[in-house]
Amino acid sequence: MSDGAALTEDAVGDTVLSIDAMGGDLGPASVVSGLAKASAKNPTLRFIVHGDKPELERLIAKKRGLADVCELRHTKDVVTMDAKPSHVMRNGKDTSMWSTIEAVRDGDASVAVSCGNTGALMAISMIRLRKLEGVNRPAIACLWPSRNPSGFNVMLDVGADIRADAEDLLQYALMGASYARNGLDLSRPRIGLLNVGTEEHKGRAELKVAAELIDRAAPAADFEFVGFVEGSDLPSDRVDVIVTDGFTGNVALKTGEGTARLIRELLEQAFKKTPFSRVAALLAFTSLRRLSKRIDPRRVNGGVFLGLNGTVVKSHGSADPTGVAAAINLAAQLSATGFHKRLAARIAQAEAAASVAIQKEGSSE
């Protein structure tokens, strides 16, 4: 699921994406610039853009040809980054975020994209799109750079809910396996449960129970459970999907992003320090550019809400145009593969099969 490659025209078809232009720290200018970048690579994409119409018209007019692929829907309010989800649920109907989700609910667009307040976006998504049958807590899944052939691992939850009991973690494993099949084209994903160590006796009680549930469900759900994994396994090729609660996952995600930025900054400083280091940088330019791209958090910008009757991609609030374009391209790929319908069917099948397997094993004990 590389953000750099353009989709073929046949794959995209008449894909329409719903874009919240007003969410995010950098405002609508960054979102519109990201739209222009994504449209340049995939010119058959169409967008429904939500926000302040006069401001959006002015920004879009500066991007050649962008107005031709955008439908604007005016909203008078914006969900701020410090807004409480409960307040937005009661008073947010006139916001760009609400309108963005509504377009997916009404079938006008296939995927929603927003850089806005994560809690508010999840709250609106849950009340307007509703949860898939059998899902207790939706999760946010992200792609994590790794040594695997695809270049990525999937990790969830990374911030939808700070709590998760054993049953929730089992559902995350089922949803993560489905995402890996559809998003990374893995026929039998390897699932790992994040813990403070790989030994079976380590970790909280709910993690040990979750490990048993996931292990029992694995044969029927057609994935491999590798057991507990720890932080050092996140970028490894030992696992394809890392399952954890939203608190731990979000801390891990932000730590990884901060570390990647630190490495880039330290490399830049090191190669600018002396004339000799500048020459070395020129000689190693191609390799350094490849490394920089590989660890750039912007190229995997976009968490996917799993477990809802609709697909929502959450971009980072601080995403620049490159990051916004990556999130839009991810949304386009999910739409082109019919991800939501396949995920819903897979979860229903996996839940049923896992339930039968667990009941059989329980009755035989």
Swiss-Prot record:
Organism the protein comes from: Jannaschia sp. (strain CCS1)
Catalyzed reactions: a fatty acyl-[ACP] + phosphate = an acyl phosphate + holo-[ACP]
Principal localisation: cytoplasm
Family: Belongs to the PlsX family.
Signal peptide: none
InterPro entries in the cross-refs: FA_synthesis (IPR003664), Phospholipid_synth_PlsX-like (IPR012281)
Keyword field contains Plastid: no
A GO cellular component annotation in the UniProt record: cytoplasm
Gene3D superfamilies in the cross-refs: Isopropylmalate Dehydrogenase
The name this protein goes by in its record: Phosphate acyltransferase
Subcellular location: Cytoplasm
Enzyme class name: transferase
UniProt key word Transferase: yes
Function comment: Catalyzes the reversible formation of acyl-phosphate (acyl-PO(4)) from acyl-[acyl-carrier-protein] (acyl-ACP). This enzyme utilizes acyl-ACP as fatty acyl donor, but not acyl-CoA.
Alphabetical UniProt keywords: Cytoplasm, Lipid biosynthesis, Lipid metabolism, Phospholipid biosynthesis, Phospholipid metabolism, Transferase
EC number: 2.3.1.274
Pathway: Lipid metabolism; phospholipid metabolism
Molecular function per GO: phosphate:acyl-[acyl carrier protein] acyltransferase activity
Subunit structure of this chain's protein: Homodimer. Probably interacts with PlsY.
BP GO terms, sorted: fatty acid biosynthetic process; phospholipid biosynthetic process
